[in-house]
């Protein structure tokens, strides 16, 4: 499955986490970037050791079709496997350890976690799909008695709200009630702020060796993975994407 931009001559492919792909596609369309989005299943997050191999497999499929490929993932529990892949092939990924960093900024997540280590984060995607992505995946629909085992160390739910719609507010409230924890909402500006955010050329310091072009991976520059991936440590998803689409 791919989510093409309006342009018919896209020269850049972004292999993206399915949890981010709709937002990424929308931003690329708003910015007029000639980008095709190729999402991978969001439930790979439950098997993070499979993320890097899945990304590499997709790179092999797409390399001959695009001038450049970028990775629409943070580290996402791969413990450096995505950075190793990016370094080896000369690719750039999104900044941060996980998608919470992408939306809110690593400093904000660190601050919230330090203030209350037992913070359970939800993005809009997780909020909307909580029943399927969390409740059923953990087996709590079949074994609700396991709820204390899964969440005993959590003390609050923080929803990182990119779109604060009535439907999502209700979903976040329901999710917190299901877990039995108080809900706090942190508006991350997200897509509303991103619409007026970075355009071409944003995302300074995206790193050398920006892309594996046709033939995937020739000329990986120093620091192309971990250093480049950390290029847009704050500034919202648009700024992070600008660093992928228009690296310096």
Give the ranges of each region predicted by the language model:
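Gly/Ser/Thr-rich loops at beta-strand to alpha-helix junctions
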Residues: 15-22, 44-45, 72-82, 100-101, ...
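N-terminal basic/disordered segments at the start of proteins
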Residues: 1-31
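Long, charge-dense
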Residues: 80-133
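C-terminal, charge/polar-rich interaction regions
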Residues: 161-203, 227-248
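A conserved mid-domain beta-alpha-beta active-site/ligand-binding segment of alpha/beta enzyme cores
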Residues: 114-169
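A short beta-strand-loop structural module common to alpha/beta enzyme folds
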Residues: 34-51, 185-189
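Long, intrinsically disordered low-complexity tandem-repeat segments
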Residues: 198-230
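Glycine-rich, highly charged phosphate/nucleotide-binding loops
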Residues: 48-61
